[in-house]
Amino acid sequence: MESKIAVITGASSGIGKAILEKLSKNNFRIVACGRTGNVVLGENSENIEIVTGDLLLETTSDELLNKAINVFGDCDYLFVNAGTIESGSIETIDIDKMCKMVRLKVESSYRIIYTFLKYFKKTGKGYIIITSSVLGTKTRENSGAYAGCNYALEALAESLRMELSDTDIQITCIEPGLVQTNLHRDWPVHPKELLNITNTLVPDDIAEVVMEIISKPSHIRIPKYMILPKGHKI
């Protein structure tokens, strides 16, 4: 694959970090955004630019796009990956943390896609890959808020798919089941225990799927890609 240019949000850990590492090994030039700035550089670090940015700020989307253009001359891919998980019943969930999750998962995703889409329309090509969830297609007890955020991303992606169907701009929603990341580190009981899943997915599984998707010929469209671990019933 020829050298391409990508912007990745949520690149400091989990799925975003795995995608960063996989793209770097495949000769991508990358602008990596992590809120903490703790983006670990591996292979081909000279082709990675780090932006420590808060995606809740209106200026961050423009900053990321401008960084890609000014440093690498273009942008081919946008990976929308930043997010967090807040769970609990509608009655008992921490409402402030829930609202922050909604802003990060929904508002910031819409905002950055809005910004990059205008550039992709101008250049006539581009690919947007959104990390959603299996809980963007269904819900379960104590997951209404998180599922609702992912439903919003799925709706955005489906509308974009139709609006862009006759263009060379593509969009894919990745819908993972349970992935072993730090997002569950503060949970009193890990979801793999609650769901009785022995072998969860790992971030590298998602990165492998991403490479498979973006390696397809451009006339092949993959709007959704659900990936689940064995034993994931919901």
Model-derived features with residue positions:
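Alpha-helical segment proximal to the catalytic Tyr-Lys
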Residues: 118, 162-165
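Substrate-binding pocket helix/loop in short-chain dehydrogenase/reductase
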Residues: 89-90, 97-102
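Active-site helix of classical SDR
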Residues: 113, 149-152
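Conserved glycine-rich Rossmann-like NAD(P)H-binding loop of the short-chain dehydrogenase/reductase
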Residues: 26-41
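Residue(s) in the substrate-gating loop at a strand-loop-helix junction
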Residues: 133
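Conserved glycine-rich cofactor-binding loop
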Residues: 12-13
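C-terminal helical subdomain
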Residues: 173-174, 194-231
